[in-house]
Each structure stands twice: as C-alpha cells, then as structure tokens.
Amino acid sequence: MADPTTYRPAPGTIPTEPGVYKFRDDARRVIYVGKAKNLRARLSNYFQDVTQLHPRTRQMVFAASSVEWTVVGSEVEALQLEYTWIKRFDPRFNVKYRDDKSYPMLAVSTGERFPRAFFYRGPRRKGVRYYGPYSHAWAVRETLDLLIRVFPMRTCSKGVFNRHENLGRPCLLGYIDKCAAPCVGRVSEEEHREIVEGFCSFMSGHTDKVTRELTAEMMAASEELDFERAARLRDDLGAINKVMEKQAVVLGDGTDADIIAFATDELEAAVQIFHVRGGRIRGQRGWVVEKTGDWDLPDDSDAEGPDPALPHLMQHFLVQFYGDAVERAESEAAEDAEHIERRGVDQYREATPAVVPREILVQVEPHEAQETRKVLEELRGAGVDLRVPQRGDKRSLMETVEKNAREQLKQHKIKRVGDLTARSAALQDIQEALDMEQAPLRIECTDISHIQGTDVVASLVVFEDGLPRKSDYRRYRIKEAAGDGHSNDVASIAEVTRRRFLRHHRDKLAVPEELDDATFSDEKVEEMSTDNRRFAYPPQLFIVDGGAPQVAAAQEVFDELGIVDVTLVGLAKRLEEIWLPGDPDPVILPRNSPALFLLQQVRDEAHRFAITYHRQQRSKRMRVSELDDIRGLGQARRTELVKHFGSVARLREATVGDIAGVRGFGPKLAQSVFEALHPPE
C-alpha cells in the first residue's frame, strides 16, 4: 500500500485541459478511471489532506502506486473515453452497473431454424433476443402461457423437438393448439417465422397493431359465418387483453420513456429504472453500487437536502447503461444479419425499438447535462428529451420509482449487514486458524475432475472479500500428468499450481521496470497498458482439494518458483481436515465455524466448476464426427453438410459433384471430403 505522496506528479506537470486519468496499483492494474474538465485541478484534490477524502476515495489513493492521464479535445470526448476505459479495464473502484443475472426474462432463440420462446434467467447469449426483465418468474411463465394461444410458436427444448420429429407426432401442446408443431411439418419454416414475427412484434410493444388485426379477423370470420374460428379469435383477444392488463397504463399519451431514480446513503446508492413503452410499464430493473466519492461537491454538501452526489451518479449511470445497451443491441443485430445472410431470408422484418428512448425522465439533472445529452443523442442517432418531470402522471410515476429505489436500498442494507458480518468473521477466523499475517482477501482454490483417467481437467476459482469473482475463474486441461486412461491427482495438482504461478510471474513481467514509476501521460505508457492482468498478483491463500500428498506436491512447486508470500493449505473432503505443508497433523475447525463454512464454499465451487468443464469435454469427445479431421472443414461447413444431406451416412453416398453443389464448397474441398469418407482399402 503506497503513500500518495510517493507518486504525486511534480508541480506544474499536469495539464489544465480536459482529460481522462487512470490510477494503477503496484501490479500495474488499473483500479480507477476518472474524467475532468481541468486535469490539474481534479488530480490535485487527491494529493491534498487525505483525511478529508471520501472513505472509498481514500482507500483508492492508498491502493494506487501511479497515475496517468490523457488529454482530450472536449468534455464530451472525455465522457466517451472514460466510458471506454471503464469497459476495457474494469477498475474495481469505479461505480459499475452490471446486468443483474438473477432477473427473469422471456427469451426467443432467433439463431435457430425454428426459434423457440422460453423462460430464461442468466447472462445474455448470442443468437437470443430478450424481453423484460420481469420482477417475478411466474409473470414470465404466465405471459408466455397466454401468448402461445395467440402465437403458437415452438417452446420446447432441442431434445424434445428432435424426439417428436423422429416419432412423427407432436407433443401435447401441438394437440391442444398451443404449438404449431413445426417438428412434424404442420407448418413450414416460413409459416413458423410469421408466427415468431407476430410474437416479437407484440413483445416489442406493438400491441395495438396485433389487437386491431385479431379484431378484424374475428369480424371477418363472423361475417363469413365461420363462428368456430371467430370464437377462437375472440379467446385469443381475451388472452391478449389479459396480458396487457398486467402492464397497467401509466402514461396515457402512448409515451416511450425510461424513468430513472436513485436512493443513497453515505456509502452506497440504489438505482431503479422503469421502461415505459406505449404508455405501459414493460420492464423494471435495479442495482445497488458503492459510491466512489470522487466528485467536486459544494462546500455545504453535508447540509440537509438531496444528496449532492446525485447528478454525478446520474451522469455515470446514463452513459454506462445506454452505452452498454447500444453495444449489446448492435451485437445482436450483427448476429441476426449473419443469420439472415446464412439462411438467405429476412427472418425478422419487425423493426427493433430504439434502445435509447425518445424521452428519459430523471430524478435530477445529470452533471454536465448538455454533454450527457449529446452522448445519448449520438447513441440514439436522434434527439433525446432528457428532463426532470415536474407535475402530472410523469411526476407521480417518478415518485413511484424513487420509492422503489429507497425500498431496494433498505432491503440491501438489511441483507448486507448480515452477509458482511458473516464474511468478515469467517475471514478473521481463517487468519487466526492458519496463523496468517492478514485476513485472506483473495482466496484461490483448485480441483481435479476425471472419470477413470479420461478427460482430466482442473478448475481454479477465485474468491475476493469472501465472494466469488467469476470473471477470474480459469479451466485447465491436464497435459503432463494424464493420458492413455491414466491420471495422477497429485501430479495434476502440481501441474495446475505450476501453470497458475508461472502465469503470475509472466504477467508481472509484462510491464517493463522503467514504466513502474510512471506518473505522466506519454506514448510508451499507453502502448504498454494491458487489459485486466488478473494473475499479476498472488492470492493470500491458495487451497488445493485433497490432503497431505496434494499439499506436498503444491509446496514443491512453491519452493521451485520461490513463492513465499502465499499461504498454502489442503482441504480434505471426508473429515473436512485442513492440511498445512510439513505438518503431521491437520487443523480441525469446529463444524459450526464460519471459517470452515467459507472454505467449504470455496472448495465446493471449485469442484462444481471442474465437474462442469469435465462434462463439457466428455460430451465434446463423444460427439466426435468423421468430418472433424478433414482439413479446411470448420464447424459452419460441417453443419451445412449435415443439414444438406441429413446425415453422414447419406453424405457418404454422395458424389463429388453433389458435395460441390452445397453452398460454400468448391471442387477441391468437395474432393477432400469425398476422399476422407472413402479411404483406400
């Protein structure tokens, strides 16, 4: 931990222009990114009386060991570069509004030949379009159940679809008209596509259009005396209206707007956003983040009234949230375009609604409101009405959003008090039990997984402050200690330990020594800046899954590499014994110990991650095809071949000319495929 005075820039060396700056720690990781109208004025604040800094800012300046900056032409450029660097370096002291993966959503797998609609909770995936998020899982399932009456698109998994395709008869949903049964050819690919388009159109907010079309069809059926069809359309309209009733009309003028509000205390901030489309609330989400305190606040900032940090929080949220949303939408659009090009048809003609709405209603005007508006308008490609509602329905809705933010912060604090106390107690107990100099703020654990020596893999999981840091997880295929159906768990532990800490040494050496003391902005520093070198610093505690033999193997690697500042232990599964290097007897923690509970949690997470990877590798090996080893034949072309001929067996019956007729195959590649499938006897 460095004293800020040791890396303070020399007087007069900091420019007075607008710019963006980075603080780095002694491992050269970027730990904070900020922007300023005047770099000299802003950076000087960090090196004044540190006792006057916000607690989190004070922690940051002591964790840092150098500072760099880049001068830009305007405040708008500074705002954009700050967003880019936060995305690139993921600094731990910046406010980050990450997508909450626990929110339930309704998803449509647009990348499949016959897209399906399904309930989903988790990180976003390629080739899938998402609607929501919803506040409750039952709301997603009920909405889907009602809508497939009107839009009977596929909802089954790939396995169920293939099974019924082979059986030649549909599932129950096909018999009760809640699925158009594309698996048995009841509808063509194009007809199913039209159903999906209607579903996506409705979920995108074009509800009036769908209602008008159904009403017109119902009236036409009635006039033609087709009362059975008219009754079915009437029931479909009832289902549509039931879905719409659940999305209460809050703004009667058909407004498309996002409403955003914060609730804060001294250390944290909760933000809620309501998405209103066509006057109805279509989605809601929220985050709780730590405040950085890195803002120029007025001298009377402790006075009663609104939190003076709110404008800064609002600015950061708007730029980060909509920047991420536009980037994600562009990625999804590119995937759709690739799919359209590959299939040769325009599968989804319905226009996707703008990610940045026409109107953004905020609790307070953001800091540098004009610059923020310009950034949002660039993201939208059109004007954005960014304002604080003063009266009427919009003001009432803002108060509702503020109330939700306050409730979210309250519930978070209640939960956090319990969680933080338990984690702190567990880390303290581990420190005392293992006689460590400090509590292990970073813990790493490795585990081996295999079945009778096949597909031998290892996992490395990371916990920081007692919580999993999944972005730092690593997976390894064991190379030296396994093969030919044999596996040595002890040697495998040694191999993983060696590879992990060799990576540590390599990442530490990635930055030349002459740049270690850089406190200015120049081209060399920028060229050597690297994205998150997460293994450039060691853990305080390294856990291996196993007993004394595994610990001894890892300790040999430590001795070989000269690692002396990492505590090494083994956690044996059967009796939950903790083994230390060289000790004849294990450490036994009480069964109700918070320390043991945390160590078990880390070990079990490593086991889960290893098992998952092992299953993936085993499944991959079992899916090996005769086409896999053909030179010049990648995954896309293999898929195209099997799709065209139906199976490898039918492909084997094809001639070179037949193969050359497949899209993307020339005579030379077709000949290679033919020869690979017909080897000389």
From Swiss-Prot:
Residues 16-95 form the GIY-YIG domain. Signal peptide: none annotated. It holds the Pfam family UVR. Belongs to the UvrC family. Residues 208-243 form the UVR domain. NCBIfam families: PRK00558.1-5. One of its GO terms (cellular component) is cytoplasm. SMART domains: GIYc, HhH1. Transmembrane segments: none annotated. Keywords: Cytoplasm, DNA damage, DNA excision, DNA repair, Excision nuclease, SOS response. One of its GO terms (biological process) is SOS response. It is found in: Cytoplasm. Interacts with UvrB in an incision complex. The UvrABC repair system catalyzes the recognition and processing of DNA lesions. UvrC both incises the 5' and 3' sides of the lesion. The N-terminal half is responsible for the 3' incision and the C-terminal half is responsible for the 5' incision. InterPro entries: GIY-YIG_endonuc (IPR000305), GIY-YIG_endonuc_sf (IPR035901), GIY-YIG_UvrC_Cho (IPR047296), Hlx-hairpin-Hlx_DNA-bd_motif (IPR003583), RuvA_2-like (IPR010994), UVR_dom (IPR001943), UVR_dom_sf (IPR036876), UvrABC_protein_C (IPR050066). It comes from Corynebacterium efficiens (strain DSM 44549 / YS-314 / AJ 12310 / JCM 11189 / NBRC 100395). This is UvrABC system protein C. GO terms for molecular function: DNA binding; excinuclease ABC activity.
